[in-house]
């Protein structure tokens, strides 16, 4: 299902949904960040997705990362909560979500890279290289907040 993101755009459609979601900032021993190329918006992103009923938020992180990348992970820290009502995601099925994203630092504990129906590439990329890719500004904010993390989560 394709989507269009709007940030601070008065032409954005009216919000009809809020779904808590997660992203994981995962770095390898070389400091590279685990990223995926999303099939729904054709952008590079952190692995993550929507919280399902009946699961803990930690289970959401683990499930989404495994589904989108093939890696097993454990959470280290909460690095940010993002609820900008001017960041709207419109899906082709008519759902129009307000952003509600919780970001976590995590580390791999197993698995290996594989793509999914939501990700056609899985790559470890430097922060500098991400600046050269098509990455949504909200993802860069989450990455930068995580890289600057000093013990207090960003609330934006």
Kindly give the residue locations of the regions a language model identified.
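Active-site-adjacent beta-strand/loop module that shapes the phosphate/pyrophosphate-binding cleft
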Residues: 83-112
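A short coil-to-beta-strand element that immediately follows conserved catalytic motifs
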Residues: 72-82
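Nudix hydrolase/Nudix homology domain
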Residues: 42-43, 112-156
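Short connector loops at helix/strand junctions that flank enzyme active sites
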Residues: 19, 41, 46, 73, ...
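Conserved Nudix-box catalytic region and its N-terminal flanking loop in Nudix hydrolases
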Residues: 28-71
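A structural signal for short, well-ordered beta-strand segments
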Residues: 24, 78, 104-106
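Acidic, metal-coordinating catalytic segment for phosphate/diphosphate chemistry
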Residues: 1-23, 94-95
